[in-house]
C-alpha cells in the first residue's frame, strides 16, 4: 500500500517541507510514498511584509510548482487531527467535511494574531496578520484623505512593540505623507507593556531600535497597554486618551489550535 506524507499548511514551513520531501523521495527512488499538502489556498504569502503597501503583491501561486514536482494539493482547512487513527478531518472549499489518512504528518499551520477580549478591538482596530486584513488596513488608509484635516487623521496607534509592531510603525510616517501630502505632520505611537524601547528584542539591539524610531519620529508609550478601542482612538490602562483615526493591533501571536492535538 502506498504511504502518504501529509503536510498541513502551505506557508514557508509547509512549502519547504513538501519540496524537501519530494526531493529526498526522488533521490532514493521511492515511488511508494506520495506527498500531499492541505491548505486553504495554494499560495505562498510573504507574511513578514504584510505591513507594507501594495500587499496584494506579497503572494505567489504554488499550483504550477506543486504540479511540476508531483505534490498533490488539497484545498481545505484542517479541523481535527486523530493521532491514534492517523487521520485529519478538514473542511473543503464547499464547506463539506472530509477525512484524509496519513503515514507521516507535518504540522506547519503557523500562528495567528492573538486578539484579546478588549472593548472595541475587533470592531475598530486593524491588523496585518493576513493579506485580507492588511488590505483592509490599506483601504482604510487610502480613505484618510477624505476625512477632515485633524490631528487624529494623521495619528496612528500601534499596539505592540515587537518586530511586527516596530516595522509597521516605521512604515507609517512615509505612508501618511504619501496619502495626506508632504505637509502632513504624522504622529505614530507604539504602545508597549515593556519598560524600555525594544525590550522584547534584547538589550543589544535596543539602542539601534530607539535611534531608528526616533529618526522617523515614532513615539513610544512604555509600561502601558490598550484597554479600549473606538472609532476615534484608544484608551490606555492609566486612563490616557489618544485620538487616532488608525489603530493597528500587533500585540502577540498564538500557535495554531491544531498543535494541542498532536
Question: Language-model segments: what does each one mean?
Answer:
Residues 34, 73-84, 174-262:
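A Rossmann-like FAD-binding core segment of flavoenzymes
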Residues 49-55, 122-126, 204-205:
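Short glycine-enriched, charge-decorated loop/helix-capping segments at active-site entrances
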Residues 2, 71-155, 248:
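FAD-binding core/adjacent interface of flavoenzyme oxidoreductases
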Residues 44-47, 114-117, 257-258:
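Short acidic/His/Gly/Ser-rich catalytic and metal-binding motifs that mark active-site loops
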Amino acid at each position: 500500500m502506498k504511504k502518504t506524507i501529509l503536510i498541513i499548511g502551505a506557508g514557508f514551513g509547509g512549502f519547504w517541507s513538501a519540496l524537501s520531501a519530494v526531493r529526498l523521495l526522488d533521490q532514493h527512488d521511492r515511488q511508494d510514498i506520495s506527498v500531499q499538502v492541505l491548505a486553504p489556498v495554494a499560495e505562498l504569502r510573504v507574511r513578514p511584509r504584510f505591513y507594507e503597501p501594495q500587499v496584494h503583491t506579497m503572494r505567489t501561486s504554488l499550483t504550477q510548482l506543486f504540479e511540476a514536482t508531483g505534490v498533490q494539493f488539497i484545498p481545505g482547512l484542517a479541523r481535527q487531527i486523530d493521532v491514534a487513527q492517523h487521520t485529519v478531518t478538514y473542511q473543503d472549499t464547499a464547506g463539506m467535511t472530509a477525512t484524509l489518512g496519513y503515514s507521516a504528518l507535518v504540522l506547519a499551520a503557523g500562528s495567528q494574531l492573538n486578539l484579546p477580549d478588549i472593548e472595541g478591538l475587533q470592531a475598530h482596530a486593524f491588523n496585518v496578520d493576513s493579506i485580507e486584513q492588511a488590505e483592509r488596513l490599506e483601504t482604510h488608509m487610502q480613505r484618510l484623505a477624505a476625512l477632515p484635516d485633524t490631528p487624529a487623521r494623521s495619528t496612528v496607534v500601534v499596539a505592540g512593540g515587537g518586530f511586527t509592531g516596530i516595522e509597521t510603525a516605521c512604515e507609517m510616517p512615509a505612508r501618511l505623507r504619501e496619502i495626506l501630502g508632504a505637509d502632513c505632520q504624522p504622529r505614530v505611537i507604539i504602545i508597549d507593556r515593556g519598560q524600555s524601547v525594544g525590550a522584547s528584542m534584547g538589550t543589544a539591539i535596543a539602542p539601534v531600535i530607539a535611534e531608528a524610531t526616533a529618526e522617523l519620529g515614532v513615539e513610544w508609550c512604555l509600561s502601558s497597554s490598550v484597554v479600549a478601542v473606538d472609532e476615534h482612538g484608544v484608551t490606555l490602562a492609566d486612563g490616557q486618551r489618544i485620538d487616532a483615526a488608525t489603530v493597528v493591533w500587533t500585540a502577540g501571536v498564538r500557535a495554531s489550535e491544531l498543535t494541542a492535538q498532536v
